[in-house]
Amino acid sequence: MSELVTLKTYLGTWAGADTGRTAVAQAVTAIAEAGVGIADLVARGPLEEGLASIRGVDPNAGGDAQKELDVVAEERIKAALLPTPTAFLASEESEELIPLNPDGRLVIAVDPLDGSSNIDTNVSVGTIYSILPYDAAVHTDPVSAVMRPGVNQVASGFLAYGPATILVATFGEGTQVFVHDRQTGEFVLARTNVEIPAETKEYGVNQSNVRHWAEPMSAYIADCLAGKDGPRGKDFNMRWVGSMVADAFRIFTRGGVYVYPGDKRKGYENGRLRLIYEANPVAFLTEQAKGAATDGKTRILDIQPHHIHQRIPLVFGSKAEVEKIASYY
């Protein structure tokens, strides 16, 4: 049996003596450790009284209902990152950037608890992060460090809190999967250089909204539903959890395409996912796993953000299917 590789060992080998990489390794280690604590809170479910309840009457900075556990997760991550070389934290739960370390060389964007609306139903939720380099001499306005196209990311990943606590991570050299070993307390490398199959017969979308979609997306789904007798010439399965980290992990495991389009409803014109906190980190992971990610037409990682809480339509997964969807536009 081959020797198990822990996250700590993997990061040490990857970083070596490079100070920039060491900073990234410290930040990812901190996020992973915070994630273990968040996973424990999620696992206790209704035993943790009030954590699944809506917090106040005002939505979070992204416009979504904020649960108590969203805030607790953000606090856990913020506390974990304080000793690391992270200058600022951008969070889906906070309107403004959160200053951490004035001498830091990183800025990190995080969705502390993606899918928190599913907590009551015991569905997998998770934490998504994006890491960008930061230089105070260059970025005199810290917001400008966050407001860069996703191609500038040096690392990204997500933790999925389900039957197992999973870390899917990239450092620009492929996409790796780590599993938290509850006996040793370590994250252990489970899959290296994940590759999403280019072809698929599986899509994930909330099909109940089809009546609100623009014609290109409606036409794509109609052709999938027509199956082997239709223009696609093959039968499709639909899978939709409604928690993006769970849907994403399925795609990294067995392929498929995830679709969250904009639609005609007020507030849904650009979908509901955030470019900086969700689309960019997942797009980086996807491309490093030989998949593709677009807003339906344009590569996600090339898009210039115009607001730290900007929403964007998102299509990611099996490359050929993402390109097929783009052809409908």
UniProtKB/Swiss-Prot annotation:
Substrate binds at D114, G115, S116, S117, N206. Binds 2 magnesium ions per subunit. It is found in: Cytoplasm. Mg(2+) 2 binds at D111, D114, E278. Its cofactor is Mg(2+). Mg(2+) 1 binds at E92, D111, L113. This is Fructose-1,6-bisphosphatase class 1 2. Its main location: cytoplasm. GO terms for molecular function: fructose 1,6-bisphosphate 1-phosphatase activity; magnesium ion binding. PANTHER family: FRUCTOSE-1,6-BISPHOSPHATASE-RELATED, SEDOHEPTULOSE-1,7-BISPHOSPHATASE, CHLOROPLASTIC. Homotetramer. Belongs to the FBPase class 1 family. Pathway: Carbohydrate biosynthesis; gluconeogenesis. Its EC number is 3.1.3.11. GO terms for biological process: fructose 1,6-bisphosphate metabolic process; fructose 6-phosphate metabolic process; fructose metabolic process; gluconeogenesis; sucrose biosynthetic process. Keywords: Carbohydrate metabolism, Cytoplasm, Hydrolase, Magnesium, Metal-binding. It catalyses: beta-D-fructose 1,6-bisphosphate + H2O = beta-D-fructose 6-phosphate + phosphate. It is an enzyme of class 3 (hydrolase). The keyword RNA-binding does not apply. The keyword Cytoplasm applies. It holds the Pfam family FBPase. GO terms for cellular component: cytosol. It comes from the Bacteria.
